[in-house]
């Protein structure tokens, strides 16, 4: 069974809203929303991968030394096992824009519980919003 390692972020703004990003149309689970982030590359650790992904996807920089409140999740998909660290991000530099063309959406905790999310992200919501 293939194992995929990734980092994701629960990005919260000053109003407590959480940022979601749409799936690319060419990806599986189209029409779903997910937390920003992505797969690890070239022996990166989870924090470094998150820094790279947020810069690539959203044009923002985070201080990886200030990352806290993180949790590890596993989710079994049909063809692979996802191993994911999820970090809470409340501070960043730069203006959030979609550099890769996906839609961005800020949602309240209530809206997040109703959003059509990737299966692995649903576990994350249940944990962080308990």
For each of these PLM feature ranges, what is it?
Residues 58-65:
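Short secondary-structure junctions
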Residues 1-18, 39, 72:
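Conserved N-terminal beta-strand and adjoining loop/helix that marks the start
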Residues 17-57:
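Conserved Nudix-box catalytic region and its N-terminal flanking loop in Nudix hydrolases
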Residues 4, 13, 71-95, 105:
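Active-site-adjacent beta-strand/loop module that shapes the phosphate/pyrophosphate-binding cleft
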């Amino acid at each position: 069974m293939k194992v995929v390692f990734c980092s994701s972020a629960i990005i919260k703004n000053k109003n407590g809203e959480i940022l979601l990003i749409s799936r690319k149309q060419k990806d599986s689970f189209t029409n779903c929303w997910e937390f920003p982030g992505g797969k690890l590359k070239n022996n990166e650790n989870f924090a470094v991968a998150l820094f790279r992904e947020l810069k690539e996807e959203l044009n923002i920089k985070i201080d990886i030394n200030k990352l806290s409140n993180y949790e590890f999740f596993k989710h079994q998909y049909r063809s692979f096992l996802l191993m994911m660290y999820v970090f809470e991000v409340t501070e960043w530099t730069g203006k959030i824009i979609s550099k890769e063309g996906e839609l961005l959406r800020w949602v309240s905790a209530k809206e997040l519980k109703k959003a059509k999310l990737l299966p692995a992200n649903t576990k994350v919501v249940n944990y962080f919003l308990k």
